[in-house]
Amino acid sequence: MSAGTNKAQQPHEIVERALELSRADGCVVIADEQSTANLRWAGNALTTNGVTRGRTLTVIATVDGREGTASGVVSRAAVTADELESLVRAAEAAARGAGPAEDAQPLVSGVARSPEFTEPPAETSSAVFADFAPALGEAFARARAGGRELYGFANHELVSTYLGTSTGLRLRHDQPNGTLELNAKSPDRTRSAWAGRSTRDFKDVDPAALDAELAVRLGWAERRIELPAGRYETLLPPTAVADLMIYQLWSASGRDATEGRTVFSQPGGGTRIGEKLSDLPLTLRSDPNEPGLESPPFVIAHSSGGDQSVFDNGLPVRPTEWIGAGELKHLTTTRHSAALTGLPVAPGADNLILDGGEDRSLEEMVAATGRGLLLTCLWYIREVDPATLLLTGLTRDGVYLVENGEVVGEVNNFRFNESPVGLLGRATEAGRTEKTLPREWSDWFTRAAMPALRVPDFNMSSVSQGV
C-alpha cells in the first residue's frame, strides 16, 4: 500500500477521497463509524460482555440521461483506502445500468458545514457501564435474597455519520443509543415481568428502582385470574403506546394516503389532513433537538424506498407536528412525493413524542380505575388492514386486573386487534409524558416519549397462553 492510499483512513478523508474519485454527474458518500458495548446476564449473574467496532461506507452515484436521472447505491463494510475506487466504480456502474429514478431530484446544496466534520469519530466502550454495572450487581443480590431471578441485557451504541456530496455538503452527526431490557422471573418460571429503558449514556438508569418495580409485579402475579376475550377498559403504559404510535408514523406516507391506500386517505380523494383524530388535546411530534431524545438533524438515506430518498441526503429535518391538539397536521414526504401530492416536505425524524395529556402518573391512573386491565407491554405486532391500520399482536410479561383502584392479580395474556388511529379517537385519558423504550421496535426505534393512555374498550380478541 502506498503512502498516498494509506493516508486516507479517517472517515472524513475516506469521504473526500471517494468524492474525488467519482466520475458521475452527482455523488453522495456516507461513512458510518459504529462502536458498541454490551452486557448480558441470566439467573442473577453476568454471562457475557463485549465491545465491537465497525465501518460501513455507502456510495450513491447519480447519472443524468435523456429520460431522467438514474441512481446507483453500493454499501460495503470495513472499507479500506485501497478499496475505495472499486466501490465508487461499482456505484457508477449500478447507476448506468438502472433506469431513471422515480424520486430523482437535484442533490441538496446550501446546508452549512458541520464544524466537527474533520474530527475523529466518537466511540463508546465498556466505561459507559462504570456506574451501571456495580448497581446491577447490587440488584442481583437483592433479587437473589427476594427469591427472584433477573435476566436481560444492556447495549450502548455510538454511530458517527459523515455525509459528503458533490454539491458541497459536509455534514456529521454523532448518535448515542442505549437500551436496557430487564426480566424478572419466579424460580419456577410461571411468573414473569419486564421493564425497559432507553438512554443516551446509562447515567439515568437505576437498576435498583427497576428491580423494585419488577418485584412488585411478580407479587401481583401470585394471584392468577382467568378472563375471557372481550373488550376491557385498559391502561396502556408508555412503552405500549410508543409501539403503536411508531407504527402509525411508519404508516403515515403522504403519497400512499393521497393515492387512497392508507388510513389517512380521504374517501373520494385526498388526505385526512385537518381532520380531528382525537377529542383529547394530544400532539404527536418529532424534533431532532428534543432534549434527551436528540436525533439526526438532516436526512441520512442509505437507499430509496417508502418515504426516504437518496436524493434528499443532507436535507434539514425540522420539528414537525404530525398531530396537533388532536388534529392531523402532516404526513411524511420526500421532496419528490411532496411535489407529486402538493403536501409540504416533511421527512420522518428518528424520534417521536406524544404530549398534551394530564400530569397523572400511571400509578395515579391505576388508582382512579374502577375495573380494568393494566398492561406491561405489547409484542409481535403485525398489520392486518392498511385501510384502517388495524394491527394485531400479543400482550406479554404481565396483564393485571385492577379493581377499585388496586391491582388484585394477574390475568392471562391476550391477542389484541386494534388500530392506533382508532385508539386515539377513543382514548378518554392521557397521563404524564415520559421517556420510554418501545419493546417491539427497540431494534429500530428507541427515542420516544409517551404518556399512558386509558382506552375504555380495548379489543382483546382471543386468549393467549404465553407468559
Description of each model-found segment:
Residues 1-309, 324-325, 350, 406, ...:
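Active-site bordering "gate/hinge" segments
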Residues 269-467:
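Dual-mode signal for accessory low-complexity, basic/Gly-rich regions
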